[in-house]
UniProtKB/Swiss-Prot annotation:
This is Protein AF1q. The gene is mllt11. Its main location: nucleus. Cofactor for the transcription factor TCF7. May be involved in lymphoid development. Keywords: Cytoplasm, Cytoskeleton, Nucleus, Ubl conjugation. The lineage of its organism: Eukaryota, Metazoa, Chordata, Craniata, Vertebrata. GO terms for biological process: apoptotic signaling pathway; positive regulation of DNA-templated transcription; positive regulation of mitochondrial depolarization; positive regulation of release of cytochrome c from mitochondria.
C-alpha cells in the first residue's frame, strides 16, 4: 500500500517557496511606477509617453532581455575553436 505521507512530492527536493506578491509601495520608493492601463497611455501626449515608458516595468520576455553583445571573433580564433 502506498504511504501518502512519504510521497515524492513531500520531498525537500520538490518543495519550492512560493513567490511573494509584489508590494507596489517598494516600486514607488525606487521611483518606478506600476504599469498603467492602455486607456491611460492613449490619452497622454506623444513626447510625454516616451518618458513614461522608460519608467514603467515591461513584461519579461527573451526579446527584451538585454544580453551582452558577442565580441568580434577573428577567423584565426574561430578556426582554433573548431
Amino acid at each position: 500500500m502506498l504511504d501518502k505521507t512519504s510521497s515524492q512530492f513531500d520531498s525537500f527536493l520538490f518543495w519550492r517557496q512560493p513567490i511573494p506578491s509584489l508590494d507596489l509601495s517598494e516600486l514607488e520608493d525606487l521611483g518606478i511606477s506600476a504599469p498603467k492601463s492602455k486607456e491611460m497611455k492613449s490619452t497622454k501626449s506623444f513626447p510625454r509617453q516616451d518618458e513614461d515608458e522608460d519608467r514603467e516595468l515591461s513584461k519579461f520576455s527573451t526579446f527584451n532581455f538585454w544580453k551582452e553583445p558577442i565580441p568580434s571573433i577573428d577567423t584565426l580564433d574561430f578556426s582554433l575553436l573548431l
